Swiss-Prot record:
Its cofactor is heme. It is an enzyme of class 1 (oxidoreductase). May be involved in the metabolism of insect hormones and in the breakdown of synthetic insecticides. Its main location: endoplasmic reticulum. Heme binds at residue 462. This is Probable cytochrome P450 9h1. It is a peripheral membrane protein. The lineage of its organism: Eukaryota, Metazoa, Ecdysozoa, Arthropoda, Hexapoda.
């Protein structure tokens, strides 16, 4: 047998082994009687079009959810791994709240692709360490602490209004068109810079400032970063050995230096600024006090280090930079396409403005605006910041409904996805879900729904939801007080079909027309 035949035989053997390895886990759903999609070798049920941004992902999520109507759980294979999607409201409540101790953690695969510093962030921590960090951070997000930081956010909102006013003055027309993803990313950037990192930046004036530029680079999902994440999922040990990073360490070092310098300056000069660094420094000092108390359980209490503090700042950055900007894009998009809603909201805003008699809007006034609250809640229903959240089962458990009927048997290591976006667009949960209707929140009924969860579910929901709501309401109040929001020529009329790929953005962007109110 010549060398070419040997090489061909080895190649065929390698292909067979690769095939067998790629499909080795594809019997999980069949063995457990779970409704599922037929997988392709290696890629599972993740279409290549979705990977390269050629598919309306949100629309496909709804279609998949609808296809499995009647099943409390359905499954797909993400590459080689089985993922259980939970669509039954009672089962979601069991997993997220009642039996939370069995489902404390997010998918452990997340930790495989986390850089060392981000592995210390609240979203990545597991078990007792997560609970400890959550308890440390919770006091920093109370209503009283939000009230302290409100002025910083309000200042950023006012700068955003000034920018549009200046653009209108420069325009030859009575209106201007803006791409809102860029606009709200700059707003979110300035809020995060001042609230989480203690620095004031006006990204509307200094368009290419370093903080904004590096933030854009870190939040941008490139094809190579997707490939690296997939390789981490397939070959976690190899990727760790090769020390391949998903994020650029130079960018992380930049933010690390900002936090370290801010902490050192404040400690040396006894500076107090009402922002996240100050609140986290307070939490750090409280932790040191707890550690010095010998009556505490020393095995439970661990030190809150500078790296822990930095990790939380980075987490706030990622959450604020992308999630807030996207949520504001969707919210203002709905307002421009629903003029009746916008007009009614403007009536409430102008009424509050007149009550203030020239005084600045306060946090308490903002939080008591009922219709503004309804509009924001409905926008978060239709376009939730997190399209899905996950839990990993810690130990085997049978889950039963209130009548004693078994809903699902979860096994240790199972990854359970709660498809928030699909649940919010399910007519069984919300009547006429594609219709933007703030009135569904008029009596609080929709808010109490077991499947309304824009910020997650249970004890592991988003700790910063109060701050997120404050940001959304603050900038929307200022924009509608000063401008009419109208559809532009490039405004998408079919977002579900136009949003493709990994980012929640239509292919042509979010375009709005602004007219100054008289």
């Amino acid at each position: 047998m010549d060398q070419s035949m040997i090489a061909l035989a080895l190649f065929i053997i390698l292909l067979v082994l690769l095939y067998k390895w790629s499909v080795a886990k594809y019997d999980v759903f069949s063995e457990r009687g779970v409704s599922h999609e037929k997988p392709w070798p290696l890629i599972g049920n993740i279409p290549l079009k979705a990977m390269i941004g050629g598919m309306p992902v949100l629309k496909k999520m709804i279609e998949l959810h609808t296809k499995h109507t009647g099943s409390p759980v359905y499954g797909i294979y993400a590459l080689r791994d089985a993922v259980f999607f939970v669509r039954d409201p009672e089962l979601i409540k069991l997993i997220g709240i009642k039996e939370f101790d069995h489902f404390v953690n997010h998918n452990s695969m997340h930790n495989n692709i986390q850089e060392s510093i981000l592995s210390k962030s609240l979203i990545s921590l597991r078990d007792g360490r997560w609970k400890e960090m959550r308890n440390i951070l919770t006091p920093a997000f109370t209503g009283s602490k939000m009230r302290i930081m409100y002025d910083l956010i309000q200042s950023c909102s006012e700068e955003g209004v000034i920018h549009i006013q200046e653009q209108l003055e420069l325009s030859q027309d009575a209106s201007i068109e803006l791409e809102m993803k860029d606009y709200f990313t700059r707003f979110a950037n300035d809020v995060i810079a001042t609230v989480a990192f203690g620095i004031s930046i006006n990204s509307f004036r200094r368009k290419d400032n370093e903080f904004f530029r590096i933030g854009q680079a870190m939040s941008r999902i490139s094809a190579w970063s997707v490939v690296k994440a997939m390789l981490y999922a397939l070959f976690p040990r190899l990727m760790k050995v090769l020390r391949i990073q998903v994020l650029d360490t130079k960018n992380i070092d930049y933010f690390s230096s900002l936090v370290t310098a801010a902490m050192r300056y404040r400690q040396e000069h006894k500076v107090v600024r009402p922002d996240m660094i100050h609140l986290l420094m307070e939490a750090k000092q409280q932790r040191l006090a707890d550690l010095s108390d010998k009556s505490k359980d020393e095995l439970y209490y661990s030190e809150f280090t500078a790296d822990d503090l930095l990790a939380q700042c980075l987490l706030f950055f990622f959450a604020g930079f992308e999630i807030i900007s996207s949520s504001l894009c969707f919210l203002t998009h709905e307002l421009c396409l629903n003029p009746t809603v916008q007009d009614r909201l403007y009536e409430e805003i102008i009424s509050v403005h007149e009550e203030l008699k020239g005084q600045p809007l306060t946090y308490d006034k903002l939080t008591k605006m009922k219709y503004l609250d309804m509009v924001v809640l409905e926008a978060l229903r239709k376009w939730p910041p997190s399209i899905s959240t996950d839990r990993e089962c810690r130990q085997d458990i049978d889950l039963f409904d209130e009548n004693g009927q078994k809903l699902f048997s979860a096994r240790k290591g199972d990854v359970l996805q709660i498809p928030i976006f699909s649940l919010h667009h399910d007519p069984e949960n919300f009547e006429d879900p594609e219709f933007f209707n703030p009135e569904r929140f008029a009596d609080g009924h929709a808010l109490e729904s077991r499947v309304y969860m824009p910020f997650g579910v249970g004890p592991r929901n988003c700790i910063g939801n109060r701050m997120a709501l404050m940001e959304l309401k603050s900038i929307v109040y200022q924009l509608l007080l000063n401008f009419k929001l109208l559809p532009a020529k490039r405004t998408s009329r079919d977002l579900l079909n136009d949003i493709r790929g990994h980012g929640l953005k239509p292919k042509n962007g979010f375009w709005l027309k602004f007219e100054a109110r008289q």
